[in-house]
């Protein structure tokens, strides 16, 4: 035990208790009021001395102040003027203040102004009231007294500051606290503030010397007392139970020094071995706690615990340990507040909550970053060790065996621990990101993550990504504008997968920026407006593997391209590669949304990013234009519902005829794809192209070829006849078709285009011309088939007109004209016009009014042409005889005349009326077209008979004529008795059937039959008949 030096005359018990000015003392005698206590030399004061002291100690007069004073009226005036100005200024500024403030807020501000002004007047009022209590209302006394108080207060304050500076200067003094306090007591009071027990404190060697009648305390007695107290304390410590935390103690100076490392040191003492311990001094063993606890209150609580408990030291440790933990937790709370408000974590990067009841602090860091803000730090008391610990709650750190999760010795080291935790957390995030293969490690700076970002199609450059350890946000070193746009997205990522996805989008946008820049420099136009609801489906980005891939569709075109047609670049990016697919498509806008109207899914080209160069982009302008034209035609054909197929290059070279590729065929030149790179072929189904016309099935081959020559800007449609047609033998330069020399049956239609937007119009033009050609060929074929004779001849052949002759004895230039009426797209109608001199011209109204097929018209004209020629001959002969007999009419008055009238009810029934007004008879001969069955075959025949409407009796003059026709023409052939035939024999007639009441014959026999009947009916009439023609009626067939 080490001893301490005390002032002479002080007992050991007093020395043990001198550490506190207001400490409770077990044995304390009253201090006598001697002269030595107040520092007087004379032991006794006389009456004269007292009177003299009273006279000399009378208070001096208060210094009078005459400067810096003004009348009270001036003060009241100035205060009134100030009040008026403040109120008026408030009224003016209230009008221009924020209108969003409520009326209650404005009223509260005005009320605060009034209270402030009222307080100023109230101070002045109170001052006046105080001054009235002074004799004669002398204000100067009040002013002088206030000035004296200020001066005195300044002196006292200076002394206090001097003492504080002295106390700070003695902080590092090597004297014990007890001796230091005793020295200060001696310095300020002239003696220690301890009970003397009637001893005079002195350091002289004379033990029996008296001072003012009191003996000095001997030094040996003081030392002996301290030794006795040490023995008493040692015996008492040994006789009671102490906790293991109190094993580190030291007994000296009459007290026991108990030290708990890292927590506190407490000094206890006692009077004897039967008395309990009492508090002497307490000291915390960590810095910054001088102003955090109240030592007098702690002394009272500790003495109460030592007095009342059976195991005082156990209870004392439990109390002080809990007190220290609470104090340490509160100190950590204050330190965290300082770090959050004014320290390195200011700005909301660190937030904590302090729960004093649960002795718990929960911290959350990296509040501005989403990736690591879900972890937290907990500071509290460990249940096992009952020590203050800091626990880092992080799932990834728990799996790592090399990172601490629990920290002790937290007090004073909070900032360092937080720095270590944030550094370890950044290492975890960095290791997680490196394991995904997206980043690379920087050898120079381990805290940097390198991400390879393309700068061109062939080169990449690393960008440096770091984590700010204070805020937890990611940032790029030397960022570009594009990187700055993605920093906020990176910091909003909540998982490493999200962060990787953001970086992949960054890489994809950089690739898009590079490609767009290359296309812009070479004259392309990149559309930034088109946004599809669903991305283009690709072969790379399928459903099975699309989770790790990102896609962006670019729509690029040239200004000269057809409207709405684009080169679509589909960029599919992954962690390690980038694939670009090229397609041709047509994009339209409907109802405010972009939609793909046509997309080429067959000729999809896939390229790597490294293979794209400026040379290839320039070559795309020509090759893509060719494909655009192809797909424009394909799209147009699809709209026309025409089945089509694009011919592959191999098919073009190896399988197709050479005349489809070259105008002048040269067998010596070998086929190669390079020779025909400027030519594309599309096969077309003929029937769908001509909208299902059946007339072409026997004329043209079912497959046609549409050829595009991009070098000559020419479009051709190739076709082929199935067989040689009669149209080939006709001279027609206006057909606008070109025949192939080496393929007699092959032909083509050709047009030259200058505007790409008008290519679709050529399909309509080709379809119109082709339909016109088919119809024209079919008409010519049917004409030759129906009018197959030596006297049939096509006079003129034009695309819309066919003129021909088919009558045997025709003297006109043409007998019939067929006009093909077309509109802008298709064949509308066919019209048949008979010439005016044509014997069949009488049926023209029926042809015009009824919509007959031209095949029926041709067959009808051919079948009835002998009939109408015969009728014309009968009428012309009668007309000639009429002119000859007109001259003899006056001389021969006894002649009778028979008139012949031709009438048409419809195209299947005609009548010849023989009328003789002199003899008073009328004979009607009916000619009908009927379908009959001959030997099981149905044929069209003429049926000639007399009308049943006219009742001719035997007395009529016409009866002999009718009877003769029936007997000689209509009746079956019978022989007379002498063996001669009883009927007239019809020469050159075949297929004649006598029916008794009439006769049936074909077109070849109708002339002979009709001429024989006409001869009989005119046989008895010696006069020329009067011939008239009745206009046809509107009856239908």
From Swiss-Prot:
GO biological process: negative regulation of transcription by RNA polymerase II; positive regulation of transcription elongation by RNA polymerase II; positive regulation of transcription initiation by RNA polymerase II; RNA polymerase II preinitiation complex assembly
Record's keyword terms, sorted: Activator, Nucleus, Transcription, Transcription regulation
Gene Ontology CC terms, in alphabetical order: core mediator complex; mediator complex
An example molecular function term from Gene Ontology annotations: TFIIB-class transcription factor binding
Family: Belongs to the Mediator complex subunit 14 family.
Subcellular location, record wording: Nucleus
Keyword Magnesium: no
Role summary: Component of the Mediator complex, a coactivator involved in the regulated transcription of nearly all RNA polymerase II-dependent genes. Mediator functions as a bridge to convey information from gene-specific regulatory proteins to the basal RNA polymerase II transcription machinery. Mediator is recruited to promoters by direct interactions with regulatory proteins and serves as a scaffold for the assembly of a functional preinitiation complex with RNA polymerase II and the general transcription factors.
Pfam short name (any one): Med14
Keyword Transferase applies: no
Highest taxon of the lineage: Eukaryota
Protein name (Swiss-Prot/TrEMBL): Mediator of RNA polymerase II transcription subunit 14
InterPro entries: Med14_N, Mediator_Med14
Subunit structure: Component of the Mediator complex.
